[in-house]
């Protein structure tokens, strides 16, 4: 199962951590892992393009984390898009992805 931890301070996202594999299907055919990977990597790329200094991030096989250092409206919007997309995947595949907000 993919585990997503979203740390928030009221409505502001401080970090997003994604770990694990969905095991929906075998590697190369797993649409849940592929979808989550595309959301997370694309989101990190958007954050970097907007303001690389606003975040710290780590991204490797089966794990990604974004920590927000400096928030502004554009960074916040990108983070909201990432989380909305992840919640959409969770709605469709609740046995394979779990989102926890702290």
Which ranges hold each PLM region?
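N-terminal intrinsically disordered, cationic/polar leader segments
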Residues: 1-31, 41, 45-102
